Amino acid sequence: MPTISVNLTTQKYQIKIENGLATSIGREVQRVWSVRKIALVTDTIVGPLYQAQITEQLTQAGFQVTVLTIPAGESAKSLEQAMSLYEALLTANFNRSDGLIALGGGVVGDLTGFVASTYMRGLPFIQIPTSLLAQVDSSVGGKTAVDLPAGKNLVGTFYQPELVLIDPQMLETLPQRQLVTGYAEVVKIAALVGADFWNLVQQIESPTAILDKAPELIARSIAYKAQIVMADVQESGQRRLLNFGHTIGHAVESLADGELTHGEAVSIGLIAISRLFEQPTQIAAQLQTVLERVGLPVTHPLLQSPALFEKIAHDKKNQGALINIVYLKAIGQPTILQLPLTQFSAQLKMKQRSF
């Protein structure tokens, strides 16, 4: 299975993708870290599945492991939970020569990365993502964040892991809804890339097929994202392409207040933005076919909400009174359009009822 290298100006690290890799965690961590204290951060769902075996491997490799368990779910991605982890690290006498490992989905990875980047001005950390969403998206690229009541990811840093270890077989323990929600990000990237990757997702007709093709789907998604990240670490240019579907998707997700998963909101956002900037190539229809096959939603009543634009207007990706919109001219042909928020608002209101 592939190993993808991320080579940045200030740091290099590897992303290893291999079935059964969960049985070799101790050896893999030994390759990048000397013996030290490790805080293994996990949640109340993933912990009971994998925490014991990974703790045992790390201990056998000579590491001193402290397990820190957070509640499962988006609500744990908070400043309050970060403070709880800071205090636990202080109690266990962690310093900058020690390290953190994130074992879980996107919430665990985002929170652990944020704590690693800020505790004592930075501790090394490793990602072991266990959900498809985390494996193809949040574990790669160095974005860390916590949420505020006003919205998602409003406090965060850019901070790269020192290693990412991905075992596609871990996806077999995911509930189907969580598997499918991660697939929305795969479809997003495949639509940006086009060509063989788009042909591959067109062959996926069920959640079972996602599992069957998981190693290839993960590797292709990460290869593209790593290429983008290496060219634009802090999202000042090309990396904005990865926000395809997220402008409206994040707003809907915030308004849904936990009713929708991130991937479900992105799926809705992909269709909405494609309808808003419809092309002769019928992008929305092509995306809808691929998304609906696995049970992802493509519309939602909240798209009609008067509060939708207010959420979009407070998106952290905006630049003053300007908004950067990513849409496709055709599959594999993404473009970034910068518009005044007032113009986008008018265009949104004009087509909002058709969503």
UniProtKB/Swiss-Prot annotation:
Biological process terms from the Gene Ontology for this record are:
amino acid biosynthetic process; aromatic amino acid family biosynthetic process; chorismate biosynthetic process
Q: Which Gene3D superfamilies match?
A: 3.40.50.1970, Dehydroquinate synthase-like - alpha domain (1.20.1090.10)
Catalytic activity annotation: 7-phospho-2-dehydro-3-deoxy-D-arabino-heptonate = 3-dehydroquinate + phosphate
Q: Name one GO cellular component term.
A: cytoplasm
Q: How is the cofactor bound?
A: Binds 1 divalent metal cation per subunit. Can use either Co(2+) or Zn(2+).
Sorted alphabetically, the keyword list is: Amino-acid biosynthesis, Aromatic amino acid biosynthesis, Cobalt, Cytoplasm, Lyase, Metal-binding, NAD, Nucleotide-binding, Zinc
Q: What is its EC number?
A: 4.2.3.4
Task: From the Swiss-Prot or TrEMBL record, state where the protein is found.
Answer: Cytoplasm
Q: Which CDD domains match?
A: DHQS
| InterPro entries in the record | Dehydroquinate_synthase, DHQ_synth_AroB, DHQ_synth_fam, DHQS/DOIS_N, DHQS_C
Which major enzyme category is it? lyase
TM segment ranges = none
* Superkingdom of this protein's organism: Bacteria
User: Which residues hold NAD(+)?
Assistant: 106-110, 130-131, 143, 152
One Gene Ontology term of the molecular function aspect: nucleotide binding
**SUPFAM superfamilies of this UniProt entry?**
Dehydroquinate synthase-like (SSF56796)
Positions annotated to bind Zn(2+) = 185, 246, 262
Q: In which pathway does it act?
A: Metabolic intermediate biosynthesis; chorismate biosynthesis; chorismate from D-erythrose 4-phosphate and phosphoenolpyruvate: step 2/7
Q: Which cofactor does it need?
A: Co(2+); Zn(2+); NAD(+)
Role description: Catalyzes the conversion of 3-deoxy-D-arabino-heptulosonate 7-phosphate (DAHP) to dehydroquinate (DHQ).
Recorded hits in HAMAP family, A to Z, give:
DHQ_synthase
The family annotation for this protein states: Belongs to the sugar phosphate cyclases superfamily. Dehydroquinate synthase family.
Per its record, how is this protein called by name? 3-dehydroquinate synthase
The organism's taxonomy opens as: Bacteria, Bacillati, Bacillota, Bacilli, Lactobacillales
